[in-house]
Amino acid sequence: MSTSSSNIPYDVGSPRQQSQTEIRSILNPSTTSTGAHPSFNQYHPPTAAPPLIPSHIPLQSTTPSTLGLSLGTPLYQSERDIGYPRDQKPTSNYYDPTSDSSERRPATAESKWSDREAKTSQRRDSYPYQQNQPPAPSTDGPMNLYNGGYKSPVNSHFPPGSPISHAHPQGRVPPLVTQSPRMPAMESPISRHNGLGGGPELQDKPVIKQEPVPASTPSRPVDPMAFSSILSSAAPEPTPKPQPTPTPIVSKPRKASRQPIPTLKPEPSSAPSSRQSSVAPAPQPPTSRVPAKRKANGETKPTPKPKPFTKDQERDIVILMSKLDGEPEDSDVEFAEEKRLYQTRSLKRKLEVEKIETSKTKQRRTDFTNKMAKRLEKHAKAGEERYREVEGDAAISKVQADEIQTEKERKKDMQRKRRREKTVQNNMEQKEIALAKAQAAQDDQERHKFLRDAQRAEKKAQQTKQILARGDKGPEIRAVSPMEPNMQGGSMSTFTAVDPDSTKKPKRGGARPRKSKEQKQAEKDSAAAAQEAIDKGESPALMPIRDAAEFKDMKPLPSKEGVTKIKLKFKAPAEPVEVKEESPSAPVDQHNTKMYHVVYDQIWKDLARKEVPKVFKLAVDSYSIRASNLKKTAILASKEAKRWQLRTNKGTKDLQARAKRVMREMMSFWKRNEREERDTRRAAEKQEIENAKKAEADREANRQKRKLNFLISQTELYSHFIGKKIKTDEVERSTDHPDVAVPDKADHAKPDHGDLPEGTAPAKVTNFEDLDFDAEDESVLKAAAMANAQNAIQEAQNKARAFNKKDDAPAMDDEGEMNFQNPAGMGDVDIEQPKMLQAQLKEYQLKGLNWLVNLYEQGINGILADEMGLGKTVQSISVMAYLAEKHGIWGPFLVVAPASTLHNWQQEITKFVPRLKVLPYWGTAADRKVLRKFWDRKHITYTEDAPFHVLVTSYQLVVSDVAYFQKMKWQYMILDEAQAIKSSQSSRWKSLLGFHCRNRLLLTGTPIQNNMQELWALLHFIMPSLFDSHDEFSEWFSKDIESHAQSNTKLNEDQLKRLHMILKPFMLRRVKKHVQKELGDKIEEDIFCDLTYRQRAYYSNLRNQISIMDLIEKATIGDDNDTGTLMNLVMQFRKVCNHPDLFERAETTSPLSFSYFAEAGSFLREGSNVTVAYSARNMIEYSLPRLIWREGGRLDLPGHDNEHAGVKAKCLESLFNVWKPENIVDSAKEDGAFSWLRFTNTSVQELSTASRKDVFARAVDLVKRPQTLGRLNIVYDEEEDKNYTPVHSMLQIVNRKDRKPLAEVTNEGYLNKLFNVAKDVWGQSGMSRMEQCGRPSATAPPIEVTCSSRGAVIERQKILFNVPMRRALFGPSPVEEKALITSKVSPLFYPPKPMLPLPTSEKQRFTNIKVPSMRRFVTDSGKLAKLDSLLTKLKEGGHRVLLYFQMTRMIDLMEEYLTYRNYKYLRLDGSTKLEDRRDTVHDFQTRPEIFIFLLSTRAGGLGINLTSADTVIFYDSDWNPTIDSQAMDRAHRLGQTRQVTVYRMITRGTIEERIRKRALQKEEVQKVVMTGGAGGGVDFNTRSKENRTKDIAMWLVDDEEAAEIERKEAEQLRYEAENPTASKKGKGKGKKGKEGGGGSLEDLYHEGEGHFDDGSNRPSGTATPIAVDASKKKGSSSRKSGGGGRSKKAKTAKERLAMADGDVDMA
């Protein structure tokens, strides 16, 4: 180890260099002046250690500079190899306490506060406490020569230990400068071995003052291990030859963060440093800049310099030393003993050093090997990269070329394989053909020939199959054993010794040579001639013997696979060949050269290898052919030889068999002939019958056509007469917007009725049944239709007059004009708005009022079919106001509306016409009985003072109280939402038709919902005399327009035009875009969603459970029972599309609780505040009797029977307690045992109190205690004051270094992140929000000890519910925090923060209960995920949403989602009570903070004004598109000023798409019928009820399966056409099944349309119980008891829907 100037330790904090003389004075005892011991005690053994220096380390020079610079902290490896400039001043960012201007002087004995030892100077290193150091050796022991002063050169650097055990370590020589904070200081092992580490304070003898020695003189001999060096004095020896100092090695510059290590530069001793370490005593103490601070820290003046010895003292010392030298008798013995011990120690040290050096050598070799390996690895990688750059493209191209070649070979193999497969197929076909010919052949020879051909073809096919199975085998891959690792070095390489392609197997012999056509033909001719000769009995011409002898000597060997061998024998020539010898004198022939012989030999080899196998193959084939021919000849010869044996009685038997066969064939022929004749005759008869039926059907069709034409003409005439007076078309056209109105087409011509009379019909009125449509002429039918139409008008007017006729004469006004109650023509008088109406009617509403008044004047009923939202209610109220104001007709008026709109009718009548008295007729039976007292009078005259004018009720109550309503005579009956009476077979329709009323007005926004039959029901209701229940008219409405639209488009268009003209006089319809200019647009948008993984799994499972064949069967021949089954499947599929949680909810789960809980009593008695007690107890209980648990059984529980219970506490905690305040004070005064209290900022009382508390209480006290010491880092932030610590807190090192105040000062920004790195990283990692991977399978409270004692219960409660402990862990409650704030308590008195740390998991927190994830709840449904993103955008845009659903359970799930997203919402469905609906709608209209309104499409789609919303979302569409239109018009109606956007959620590729397509078709039907346009492109094919099942089956299948269903249906229709009897039987069965079956698709479409106030099975609480007669009850009960009848409870879906709609009698 070199001790050159480059290895000098440097001071990272000292501002200036120390002089070399000062260093020498500090470290070299020989150059130190005599005096008292310094204040530090550096340990070193008294005897220097021998120089056990390794051989590779040069000896150090013993110059004073070397001695001074060799001691100190060993440098890092990087520091040993780096040289630095000598005059560079070190700079560093670390604080050096030795460079403080207020230098602390060494403490003296007078400055200590204890008499035991002097206080050492306080050093402030980078660590706040001293490092681990060995204790000071004891000088009293006998063997103190070697007591641990030696340390291993391989010194471990451990982090500093705890400051508790080393609060005041023994002094040691501090390092010359403060070391780098990265590693603790370590002494140089070389200097310690050489005895250079001892200080003057470790010398046992007093140091005698000596003269200073020159710098070139060493302080010891060169060899410190010499015996003379041990016994010699400290006198200087002769100067040895100086060793050359190695040149400092200057390495490359390091990073900027490491400052260069400067070389200590000697300075003149006259310029002492102003900032020196307190370790080195300065000759002149400098004046401190801050004396007050040093005084506060307990520092005193330095010790005065000791006086030198006098001459007398020196003389006495010399005398004593001479006396000692004169007694040498024991010196040799002591020397020998010391030498032996020294040699023992030296040997031990040598072995240790060798062991260490050996390990270091291995480590260096390993490091060098790794270094070289890394270096070579870099070269290898560089070479690989270079190779890739140079050869990479070529290698890639070669690989690509090989791949292309391999692909070509593969394609060739595939082609070869296909050709072979084709060959096999052709051979098998030839075999089949040959077998067929053999079966068909009459001759045995031909049959055998074909059989041989079949065998030959089969053999070829088998051979080809074998070749296909064997395939083309490539070269075999040899198994190469893996190479063993090379442990000897050198390079290794492998190569293939033999090329696998070089030893190929010999190829198979080629095929036999192809024959020419002439040869083949000659062979065929010879074979045919041989066959003819054989047939004639002659012997065929065989091959000559001489031809067979050619191959006599050729013997083929058995051939094995892959081996071809031939033996050839050549006959010797008959005559010897004379060989002429060449003359030696002849010239050299050119064929006698070596090349010639090589070529000659090669030719023979080629002949032997190639040509000989071919010849052998030809020979073998020829031999096989010859043997086959011989075999055939032998067979034929044997047959000819046995021909005489065939002459037997076989011919007679064959003749009899032939005769029997002919007889059977003749009999079958005549039977077949007779059957064909009979079938032909029957077919002719059947054709005649069919022709007759067809002619009859044509006649009936013509008759029905004329009958229908008569009915339509009659209706058209009636409409024409009424239209002239009502002028509905003018009313509609006058209110059309010119920009959007549809212009009249020229071809949309009205029927030409000519000049029709206005008065009474001159012709005779003919009943419909009396007309003969076969004999009558068209003119006669037209005249009868005109007469009937005029008669119908006259009957309507007479009926109106009869209703208004009273007992007295009709009232006339003063001018004698006719009263309005007497119907008459009013001409073109325009009616003004009534003054009673407190509202301003719009133009189109005033036109509607004129139209309604004209209807009333003519005594004709009508349908006001304005689009929803145009004010049909206001127009109806204005009619009643007009009648009351102009003509004094104050009622009674009857308004029947759905239950959801009753409040709306009452409010609007009261609001617009306050003078009209409204009687709300709903409630319980008792309430309605009281209400009937106001109007149940026979001769009441309704004037302005009448008890009521308008009665408002619902459809259900009209049906239930029909007996009371029929007693009244109603002036005007208004039916709101008239589609409720669309069924003419329901009891509701029949009951309302039987009311006595002058006029009926139907209000509906959708007159056509599902089919034309509904429109027919409405027309029949308003004009029973004209639109009566003729089957033909009903047939025309329901079938001709719908079913024949596809087949007869022209007829369909004509009928639609005529239908539109018929409807014109009775129905007034305006559309929003035509009449309401200020109404915003309505935009409809379909949002397609995809199924999630969970939904697809559910959907696939449902599809897999459906049998497609069953669907096809049900779709073709099924009835309504099958419809119910299919509808159940449809509902399941719709549930999957909405949300999979409709099938199975993700439940809240928790581990098994191995405990039981107390049962709670009734909460009804507890009031609003319920006390929930802790009652969880383990299933395992440890029961103890009271005698053991409370009465003397426990040793720690004091009592009258346990006198020894408090002995331990009394002795240990009271008598022997060293923490008592008195003991602490006395100990501090006497021996100073508690003297450290003054440096810990702790009082005696605090220490005594802490000793009596447990760990938790002490932790609480620490939290409450203010931590102000760490704030000094903020106050004292200068460099020189950075480590300032008050004296009273000197030992509170951790609190002084606390960084929390710095973090509290910076609450935000990057500095805050730096102080909270762990917290910031944890938060960004997302670990706290991750789902838990596992959880315990079971939990249980701790096992408790049970005892029948109140004291045991109290003790357990105190343990479990410790209030102070809970308050410390959880902090104050929110109520207490609020009280502290409201009371304005100072923050100093606030309770401490909660001590319980935050949970690691933000989701799970401290519990194991797992709640279903709402995020997964959203993402499990494709619809809900789309809706989530859509609602976020709508919320940001300030929109308000109406959200419609079909399923109540889906609304429940949506409520959970809205709660999760914190959206405010309201809900209205069928279960909402009637009185709550008004308040709910009012809240949504008046409170803008409500974002979403959840509605049921059936319950919330009628009679509600929700114009405050501008967005409508259909989560799932209704079966009936009209219901959706009514629902969206709740927002898009009169009063809406914003644009309304309608979103419809549809799941792609599911049943919802097919339902939506069907709904669009129905909407198109409505548009065509209402507008009267062309309907050629409209699908009117709504199937009949008998085959309605097909529509549902089509929803459940895909396109291919739908095509299969269509095909099966076509086959069924063809079968029914061919077998009419079977089809009639099937229809009968279907009809019977229909009567007992469930609901059909039609019922599904109409589901809930009439029961508007109830969208679910739960009653709303407002319905009235229906009274049933006793006789009916009795009859029903008897039927039930007999088993033949059904209970009153609806069993099928159809019955339930009918009851809900009121279509059937409740009895």
From Swiss-Prot:
Bias (Basic residues): 505-515
Catalytic activity: ATP + H2O = ADP + phosphate + H(+)
Motif placement: DEAQ box: 976-979
Enzyme kind, highest EC tier: hydrolase
Keywords, ordered alphabetically: Activator, ATP-binding, Coiled coil, DNA damage, DNA repair, DNA-binding, Hydrolase, Nucleotide-binding, Nucleus, Phosphoprotein, Transcription, Transcription regulation
Listed GO biological process terms: CENP-A containing chromatin assembly; chromatin remodeling; DNA repair; positive regulation of transcription by RNA polymerase II; regulation of TOR signaling; subtelomeric heterochromatin formation; telomere maintenance via recombination; transcription by RNA polymerase II
Domain of life: Eukaryota
Coiled-coil annotated residue ranges, if any: 369-470
Function recorded in the entry: ATPase component of the INO80 complex which remodels chromatin by shifting nucleosomes and is involved in DNA repair.
Family affiliation: Belongs to the SNF2/RAD54 helicase family.
Protein's name according to its UniProt entry: Chromatin-remodeling ATPase INO80
Organism in which the protein naturally occurs: Sclerotinia sclerotiorum (strain ATCC 18683 / 1980 / Ss-1) (White mold)
Organism phylogeny: Eukaryota, Fungi, Dikarya, Ascomycota, Pezizomycotina
